Amino acid sequence: MPTNEKKLLDEDDDTLDCVKTIGNELHFYGEITQENTLEFVEAFKKLEIQLLKHKADLIGYEPKIRVNIMSEGGDVYAGFALKNILEKSRVKVVTIAQGACCSAATFMFLGGSERRIGTNAYLLIHQISTEMWGEYRDLKHEMKNCDKLMRDLKKMYMEKTDIPDRKFKKLMKKDLYLSAS
């Protein structure tokens, strides 16, 4: 590989980068993990600071960050963290679902102050899933935690979307892809 080409592979673990910055756009194309979340937050904060500096220099300039998301989901807590970061931005954030935006990736999508779905793109929301083994009391405790997470997810979707309660319950029963149309 010529030295002037940007390497796509991380030298440490041979994984593809999932976050790219192009102009005022961030592209998150990958699994929602703690590591990818940290990579995104670093790129997002750098871009946010850069745009805020432009705002200070240019009268009337209102910065905007466009976040393109293509992800089949991943870690629920990493998804919550991404949503929180976007919501707390000092710059307007437009989230755009590209391709598939599923599961925990939809939390990131909801973090935008403006949300769009690309042509031929789909969203998927569903019940949480978990794995566990252990003693009966541990299983009961895990079920209580899952019940709380489901209530919190419902509250989050109800606050951020116009999905009626009946439709939300239907969506939670079976995996259905949603499009802009």
Specify the residue positions occupied by each region the protein language model found.
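Terminal-region recognition feature
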Residues: 1-181
